[in-house]
């Protein structure tokens, strides 16, 4: 630490006032950009929350359908929503279980018999063609289309006496 402190002091003493001012204003520009990015990020989250709340108001049977992927967890985890369906960024559609705000566990997970299984096994066990993946922790599935994702969520609801 002593050596680096001395080096810094030498640089400060050896640099001109103009160099120090230039460095300061460069730092101000970087700090300004960071702050602007943080503000824009917060505004984007607020806009997403509004879209998520609108989708929740239009939901049925605890299944919320989003028009695109949006950060939805903050807006839904204290509601009675059970599933969120949205277009996957990788193609097809995804369905996720909403977690309980106290336990942080899925309110209604996908079946154990689907968990981590290959597509053929999931399709055979579910009777639904087009479910391509179920996470081993049972909180997420992927499907070929929105209708298949909806059907999978409805099947879970029905099998648990919720439909």
Model regions and ranges:
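Sparse, context-dependent recognition of short Cys/His-centered cofactor- or disulfide-binding micro-motifs
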Residues: 1, 49, 80
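Single conserved hydrophobic/aromatic residue that forms the stacking wall/gate
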Residues: 1-12
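Serine/threonine-rich low-complexity intrinsically disordered regions
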Residues: 10-12, 16, 49
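Charged phosphate-binding loop/patch that engages nucleotide di/tri-phosphates or the phosphate backbone
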Residues: 15-18, 22-30, 159-163
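Alpha-helix capping and helix-coil boundary motifs
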Residues: 16-19, 23, 40, 117-118, ...
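A near-ubiquitous, low-amplitude feature marking generic local secondary-structure context
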Residues: 18, 35-39, 136
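Active-site rim beta-loop-alpha module in soluble metabolic enzymes
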Residues: 24-76
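Gly/His-enriched, cation/cofactor- and phosphate-binding structural elements
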Residues: 53-163
